[in-house]
Amino acid sequence: EGTYVAASESGHHSRPDLNAIQHAMSWWDRVEAIFEPDEWVPVFEQVTTKPVDIEGGVSVDGLSMESTMEFQLRVPPERTPDEVRELSDAELEIGTVNWTESIPPVMTNPRTELARVFRAAIRAGGGDPRLLRKTGTSDMNVFATEWNCEMVSYGPGDSSLDHTPNEHLPLNAFDNAIDVLIDVCERCGVDDAATSADGETTPDTEAAQ
């Protein structure tokens, strides 16, 4: 993630010079051109670009035109955040980019013992496990750099509904996901994985799509 910031001298809108807002748009066009989507390459293996907020206009003192644009660049495992930042910064003509701390891409081996246990538990619950290369970030992106252990990102529901107005999870799918997680813990030898002191089932799960 990053924030592009630029300023230009204020003047009549009929002037041919580019103002700060136009500089922001021009820079973003060049960044998108660098990482132009390739229909022959899976989305997971490409850098994806997305502006998420833009503001601009005459400054409070009226002496300059200002623009601020927040954006996100998703980095595939084959590239590094530093490489993507360097390429984006190279396209700057006016303005600066303030980068936030990057979240590194992660891709795990689907043939680990933990992945096998998850597939078995899903099938035991009547489900059909599918291996996906998730394009969005999850907690695993952070934990993978700190924990030296096998990891799996699992969630029930229709992932195409993520972050949409119709995002939802049927209650039966939620209940089944809890059963899957309990089964996984039992297969991994975790005792009382989802049982509190009074015997009530209290799973700590996130109903993620």
Segments from the language model and where they lie:
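Metal-dependent amide/peptide-bond hydrolase catalytic core
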Residues: 1-209
